[in-house]
Amino acid sequence: QTIPEQTIPEQTIPEQTISVPFNQKSGSNNSFQDNGDFYLVFDETENYKVYEDWVKGWDPIENQGTFFENQIMYLNENFKLPYDVPIIIAECGESNAWYYSETNPSYSEIVICYELIDEINQFQIWSYQEDYDLAYEELTDEDWEYIGYQVLDTVDFVLYHELGHAFIDLYNLPITGLEENVADQFAAFILLETGVEEDVSIYVINAANFWLTSSEILEIDESNYSDVHGFDRQRFYNLACYAYGSNSQF
């Protein structure tokens, strides 16, 4: 038998126009209204005053302004908000960071705790000492400078992780998988796309190092299995994959 040749009718896919709420403000033609800005709030701290000057200090990456002020400037130049959203640096009583929102009236905030900044600092110091077999008193000014960059990159990652949660909520963005993973992906993307170093993967690698160190120091208990986050070592390997994808020579 001869099977007659079949002609598959050509399909025409209609052109789709996607309106993205977070494209550049200048020249934007989408319908998302820009009715607010991010702004900084530095709460007083009793137990972590050593970090007050650090969080308000000079930005060594941009070499101008302060780190958090530069982030606010970038965010307000590139993202639209339905209302003002504070980014709060505060003493919280726990090592944490979070995005919080409520309705009636609409309110959102991002909080980064001094306790988390302290934990990041301590973990990165421990990791550096382990990597180079150095005692604390043997660390040089050059060592401390490098550790400072590792801490700053990790705090930067935490900030954009929480911003990932904020944008998912404020823009009602559809996502697949765990929201915590998506927030990690957003943070990694921003650091890889906006970094000023020749090898931008170093930003994500420094942040990933914190999760690797955390997995080596902290013990896993039953609560970790019900946590909304993946295990710290899982987060490390995910970030390492993102960095490798941006630069296979990292």
Q: What residue ranges belong to the model's regions?
A:
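An active-site-proximal "capping" alpha-helix that borders the catalytic cofactor pocket
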Residues: 176-195
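Acidic helix-start/capping segments at beta-turn-to-alpha-helix junctions
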Residues: 83-98, 184-185, 200-216
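Intrinsically disordered, low-complexity repeat/linker tracts enriched for polar/charged residues
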Residues: 1, 6, 11, 16, ...
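Long, well-structured alpha-helical subdomains associated
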Residues: 193-250
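Substrate-binding clefts and substrate-entry loops adjacent to catalytic sites
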Residues: 127, 145, 163-173
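Short alpha-helical functional segments enriched in proximate histidine and acidic residues
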Residues: 78, 166, 190-193
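Short alpha-helix carrying the canonical HExxH Zn2+-binding catalytic motif
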Residues: 148-168
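A metal-dependent hydrolase signature that marks the N-terminal structural subdomain at the beginning
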Residues: 17-127, 141-144
